[in-house]
């Protein structure tokens, strides 16, 4: 799992690459927390287009990131959601 960070001054984009399973989620959250603390974004996008796999641990990462951003006055959006990841989100009831 890798995370590529890009901040354009208006939006922080975090691109997740690889597999987001239990072990990767434990590594990802501190990186995400550090980025949010450093940039204090009003808007953050999790770009999931680089994920090849995600399980329920990935859902926890998304929900924790959303909670963290709300606490700092920011908002979270997802983009580039692969089909397999979309299915996980659908099963969890997190899509429209």
Tell me the role of every PLM-derived stretch.
Residues 19-96:
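Amphipathic alpha-helical interaction surfaces in cytosolic regulatory modules
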Residues 1-15:
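Short beta-strand/loop segment at the start of cytosolic alpha/beta domains
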